[in-house]
Amino acid sequence: IECDVVRDQHGFLRLPFIFSSVLQVKPGRTIFVETAIRNHELPVLWSDDIKREVDLLTEKIDAKLIAKRRDMRDMPFVTIDGQDAKDFDDAVLVEKKPDYFNLYVAIADVAEFVRPFSAMDEEARTRGTSVYFSNCVLPMLPDKLSNNICSLKPEVDRLVIVAHCKIDYEGRPLSQDFYE
């Protein structure tokens, strides 16, 4: 229950308090999470336009998209997200060579699925990031994207943007490249 604390003309608390609203705790959240969501006006729902855009997305990646990209599916990338994460959006690989290291950083290619200036794009810009609490997440993108299509799960084809850097044994970059 939320109440307004009212003081009289001398600064003393006036009783009884004025009850202004009831804060409901959603399943999987705590009163502290609900309070943070309310106090910071964090968005938790998706508009009908975004729901329609998400419904049009397919989880199977078009073979034509895969054919245009560098195939790195046989490389042993590891995700750098926690074990309990659902949205594995980045992965790394380091290879030791005779004179240098190859560092690869793969990031889920969200832009392939979120069109510029679409409702989803505008909402993602507004949200700016996913908000992580100890027991729940308020995602920047709908679940179908963040936890499925753009999640770098093992043994599942995903589209990524890769940064590749050759680094000498002193830690100096020798070259870099970016590709899909």
Go through each PLM region and give its residues.
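Charge-lined substrate channels and their catalytic hotspots, especially those that engage the 3′ end
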Residues: 1-104, 111-156
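Residues within well-ordered beta-strands of beta-sheet-rich folds
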Residues: 102-106, 164-166
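Polynucleotide-recognition surfaces of large bacterial nucleic-acid defense/processing enzymes
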Residues: 157-180
